[in-house]
């Protein structure tokens, strides 16, 4: 079946069509909110600031341009992502959190998500205040009264919570991962503007840079498709069981383990962590303290080095691939579930030996996936550092492309799974 026939089938299925239309409707709401600014903005100073700040240019990518407009959702999903990272780190430090997340099933996940929601509020308020203080120092926002400052912080915090809610609505009632899809929507929304900027600033002397960029873009697309689609199939057999006059089991299947089971989440987490020191440095530069201002300038210079940025980016993507997979995929849980259902891996004893086998296989596969994903993520940075062509937008383009391709592949995989499930329901 060719791709356009599959698209026709998708829109013929009422339930699947409604899910996709629901996601598109959420995208529209998100883009409307991204264009509602907070009051008292100096537009000229705002544009000047973002043209000079590389770190905030990358942060603006994640918010879909909402930050460069100082909209009510200018923090994007940053506070929620930060809260999730903190809580997932706590699962590796405190056994109670780990037990809640891994062993209490759906109820434990619900509690975990509730804690993440609660942590989003103070983090959103803190980041909102830091942003307002920074923009006020830069002359983007004029002098404001304490009441207006409090109102603005509450508005920005509510915007962060609102986006978190939209992401959860997509995950629950739509299709795909809500956080990834909202970031994807923000990147796509900025694409026409980026194309317009390229056309307006066209210079024949930059043709080699454009050729190099599109060549790397093609390599990134190919690499991401390979990493997302590659998997290791582990054979699983089910023992025969007799109940009454009927026999159950006695068949073989396989347990698929993706080379990169974490998907695009390591990229999002890595960039969230990587951007944090730059945000703090920009905030400290406006405190008026000479020592803090010098320290902030040093941090900014450090982060703007392409090689340092690339090494840090690679290391964080690599580590978060392992970290997120360890949190979401438990070999012990899978082994216990197989044993309860009468399944076993040929040549491996059920229970603890199976968990150990899955653990070894998973971490060998993850080394390949994490290395490949990290390499693709920093490929534009490597080219900029070795050839000197391109600018920071080159890095942004590579990161955006990586996120977009990964999200589209994950979305398409879930759509195909929904279609196959509908086919089975007919019998």
Residue ranges of each PLM-predicted region?
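N-terminal cationic and glycine-rich segments that engage phosphates or anionic surfaces
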Residues: 1-427
């Amino acid at each position: 079946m060719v791709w356009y026939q599959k698209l026709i089938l998708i829109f013929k299925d009422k339930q699947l069509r409604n899910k996709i239309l629901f996601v598109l409707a959420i995208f529209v709401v998100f883009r409307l909110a991204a264009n509602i600014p907070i009051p008292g903005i100096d537009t000229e100073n705002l544009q000047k600031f973002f043209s000079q700040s590389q770190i905030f240019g990358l942060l603006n990518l994640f918010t879909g341009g909402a930050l460069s407009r100082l909209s009510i959702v200018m923090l994007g999903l940053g506070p929620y992502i930060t809260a999730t990272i903190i809580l997932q780190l706590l699962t590796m430090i405190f056994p109670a959190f780990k037990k809640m997340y891994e062993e209490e099933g759906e109820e434990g996940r619900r509690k975990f998500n509730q804690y993440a929601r609660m942590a989003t509020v103070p983090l959103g308020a803190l980041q909102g205040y830091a942003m307002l203080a920074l923009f006020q120092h830069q002359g983007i926002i004029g002098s404001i009264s304490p009441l207006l400052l409090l109102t603005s912080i509450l508005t920005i915090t509510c915007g962060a919570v609102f986006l978190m809610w939209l992401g959860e609505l997509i995950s629950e009632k739509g299709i795909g991962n809500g956080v990834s899809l909202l970031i994807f929507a923000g990147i796509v929304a900025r694409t026409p503007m980026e194309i317009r900027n390229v056309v307006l600033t066209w210079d024949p002397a930059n043709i080699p840079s454009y050729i190099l960029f599109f060549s790397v873009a093609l390599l990134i697309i190919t690499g991401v498709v390979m990493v997302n689609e590659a998997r290791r199939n582990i054979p699983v057999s089910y023992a025969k069981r007799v109940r009454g006059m009927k026999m159950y089991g006695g068949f073989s299947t396989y347990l698929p383990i993706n080379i990169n089971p974490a998907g695009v989440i390591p990229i999002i987490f890595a960039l969230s962590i990587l951007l944090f020191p730059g945000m703090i440095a920009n905030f400290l530069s406006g405190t008026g303290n000479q020592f803090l201002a010098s320290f902030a300038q040093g941090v900014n210079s450090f982060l703007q080095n392409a090689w340092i940025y690339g090494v840090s980016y690679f290391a964080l993507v690599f580590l978060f691939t392992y970290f997120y997979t360890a949190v979401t995929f438990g070999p012990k849980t899978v082994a216990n579930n197989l044993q309860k259902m009468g399944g076993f891996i040929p040549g491996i004893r059920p229970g603890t030996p199976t968990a150990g086998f899955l653990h070894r296989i998973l971490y060998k596969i993850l080394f390949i996936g994490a290395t490949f994903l990290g390499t693709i993520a920093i490929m534009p940075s490597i080219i900029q550092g070795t050839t000197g062509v391109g600018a920071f937008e080159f890095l942004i383009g590579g990161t955006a492309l990586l996120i977009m391709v990964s999200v589209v592949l994950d979305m398409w995989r879930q759509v195909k799974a929904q279609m196959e499930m509908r086919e089975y329901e007919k019998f």
